[in-house]
Each structure stands twice: as C-alpha cells, then as structure tokens.
Curated annotation (Swiss-Prot):
One of its GO terms (biological process) is pollen maturation. Glycans are attached at residue 102. Residues 142-356 form the BURP domain. GO terms for cellular component: exine; Ubisch body. PANTHER family: BURP DOMAIN PROTEIN USPL1-LIKE (PTHR31236), BURP DOMAIN-CONTAINING PROTEIN 13 (PTHR31236:SF10). The lineage of its organism: Eukaryota, Viridiplantae, Streptophyta, Embryophyta, Tracheophyta. The gene is RAFTIN1B. This is Protein RAFTIN 1B. Specifically expressed in anthers, in the tapetum and microspores (at protein level). It comes from Triticum aestivum (Wheat).
Length: 362
C-alpha cells in the first residue's frame, strides 16, 4: 500500500512540475470539476494557484512562522495553554500563533513579545491592534462591525501567500492517503518526512484540529481535495447552489499601512456561512466550520501609499454567547460573550461559502 501511495504521489509531483512549465496545459481535474458544479463562480486566484502551482515555489513543506499575522482566527475554544510561540507552531496560510476560530478557550501566547493595544481613538475606535516583537507598528487583529463603513481606517499587514507545497492533490490520491493522528508515522514515511522534522508538529496539529469535537450547533469538516471541499460545503449549507467569497490580496503580501474603507458590500445568503481555512500540511487541507449566526462582507480598501488597493472578505460573528470569556477578542475589543459582534478578515486563500440568493424579477 505504501509503495502504491508513493507512486501516486510521484505521479502527482510530475504533473505539478509539468503544469508549472507549460503555460497552456490542460486544466486540472479539480478545475474541470469546479467549472461543472459551480459554472457561475470563477475560480478564486488562490484556489487556481493551488491547482496549478509551479514546482519552483514548492521548496519546503514548512511555512515560515514570520510570514503570518499575529492570530489564527479559526478556533474560539482552545485554552491559552495550547498556543505556543515556538517555530513548531506553524499555522495556515497567513495564520498566526493563535487559533481564533476556537470557541471555548483563552488565546494568549506564553512567552510572546507582542503588545496588545485597545481600540485607538485616532482610528475611529473601531479596531483592536497589536505591536509585534516590541515594535511600535500595529496591525488590526479583530474589529467592531462599525469599522465596516466607508471612510473608516484600519492598519493591516498582509503577509506573503504561503500555500501548501504540493497544492491540491487529485481526489483519488488524497482519498488514498490516510489522514488521522494514529496514521501519522505512516504518513511521514509516505512523504519521506523524518520523524524529527520541523514539519511534524504542524502536521500533527492539523490532524488533531480536524479530529477535535465540535461545539453545540457547529458543523465542521476537513477536506483534502478540491472536490471534497466543494461537496462538503454544499452538504452543510443544504444546497448545491453556493458561491465562494474570498479576499483579493497580493500574493507577495503588502507592508503594514493604514487602509481606508472605500466600499462595502454585504454578502447575501446568511445568517450562517461556511468558513474554510487552509491548514499547515504537505498538501492542501482545508478545515471548515459553520460560522454560527454571522454577517459577512466584502470590503474594498485603499492603502495610505495610494497604489495599494485590496478587497477583504470579513466575517462578523453576531452571537458570541458560547465563546470563552477569556478569548482574546473580548480583551482587545472591550466586549464579552453575547455582546457586540466580533469581526475579522479572511486571509489570502481562506474561503467563505454562502448560499446563492435568487432575486425575484422586479
């Protein structure tokens, strides 16, 4: 079995390399699937990149912890003791040292040198910021819903995109590879990863996150192929008529600067969405969960430098009553469980799935 998997993976790597060398190669199977089941939804740039990732970009299974925002907003339930500042804690593409889609735990990193700041009156009092490593620079972590208004200003740092080394595996390959913590030794052998590699802790963390129980009222799944990602999102939302909403950000990232909101568009199809976050793994794995009662937006912003314009997808959680009272968002925003909505952006490559809303003819 192991030899069979190795052969499949080798074939996949050859295909990835060929795709990177041939500008007009045939579309990947996942791309064909997407166009068939989501004909009215163009492939987001980040997803297309995962399907046609040049081999030259895939130099390591390990993501650089320095190229991450300060928090990982995917888990509102983990205890602060679960979050370590070490380089072995490698989070998803653009995610950081905290899991902030975890609903039942405090999020404080032991030994961190980051300084947390309350909302600033100079920036309309709408966001919570943090200075990294003792530096004076600050970047938005969480923000109040009132920040999602034209004219509001927020500082953001967008790190470079760091997709999984192998991108999306073909479905038949992904389905053939075990995906459990119990099978981790065999998984490492399949990928030729040493047991003492710095990749291992992040892989194990991803597997454990996918196996962890959900809170009341939440649906969660992990998808190891593009086909599984789309089909599972359809199943959770109860319809095949769905669409993806993503942030439009530069792949190379953008330096910290103050952005001004110039346009806001609510995302229809709520109040429950499916949020998907790519996890640290040799190939692309998305961990997805229902957001609970939420409002979602696409927000157009212009940077202080003039030329830097971005569009972020943002989620505002309107019911935080089940979140841990010690969650860092409450500390930064000065609120509490069941209080005002808590908002955060979706980094590059992360996806909000929403039901398509059909309007009646006027």
């Amino acid at each position: 079995m192991a030899r069979f998997l190795v052969a499949l993976l080798a074939a996949t790597l050859v295909a990835v390399q060929a795709g990177g060398q041939l500008g007009h190669a045939a579309p990947a199977t996942g791309e064909v699937f997407w166009r068939a089941v989501l004909p009215h939804s163009p492939l987001p740039d980040a997803v297309l990149r995962l399907l046609k990732q040049p081999a030259a970009e895939s130099t390591s299974f390990v993501r650089d912890p320095e190229d991450r925002p300060p928090f990982d907003y995917r888990d509102y339930s983990r205890s602060s003791s679960d979050d370590e500042p070490s380089k072995s804690t490698v989070a998803a593409s653009g995610a950081g040292g905290f899991d902030y889609d975890n609903y039942s735990g405090a999020d404080e990193r032991r030994g961190a040198t980051d300084e947390y700041k309350a909302p600033s009156s100079s920036l309309a009092g709408s966001g919570a910021y943090m200075a990294r490593g003792g530096k004076a620079e600050t970047t938005t972590v969480f923000f109040h819903e009132e920040a999602v208004r034209v004219g509001r200003r927020l500082p953001f740092h967008f790190p470079p995109a760091t997709p999984a080394a192998l991108g999306f595996l073909p479905r038949q390959v992904a389905d053939s590879v075990p995906f459990t913590t119990a099978a981790l030794p065999g998984i490492l052998a399949t990928f030729g990863i040493a047991s003492d590699s710095t990749t291992v802790p992040s892989m194990e963390a991803t597997l454990r996150a996918c196996e962890s129980p959900t809170i009341a009222g939440e649906s969660k799944f992990c998808a190891t192929s593009l086909e599984a990602l789309v089909e599972r999102a359809m199943g959770v939302l109860g319809t095949r008529d769905i669409r993806p909403v993503t942030s439009t950000l530069p792949r190379a990232g953008a330096p910290l600067q103050t952005y001004t909101v110039v346009a806001v568009q609510p995302v229809e199809g709520g109040p429950v969405f499916v949020a998907c976050h790519d996890e640290a793994y040799p190939y692309t794995v998305y961990r997805c969960h229902t957001t609970g009662p939420s409002r979602a937006y696409t927000v157009d912003m212009e940077g202080a430098r003039g030329a830097d314009a971005v569009t972020i997808a943002a989620v505002c959680h309107t019911d935080t009553s089940l979140w841990n009272p010690e969650h860092v968002s409450f500390k930064l925003l000065g609120t509490k469980p069941g209080g005002t909505p808590v908002c955060h952006l979706m980094p590059y490559g992360h996806i909000i799935w929403a039901k398509n809303v059909k309007r009646s003819p006027a």
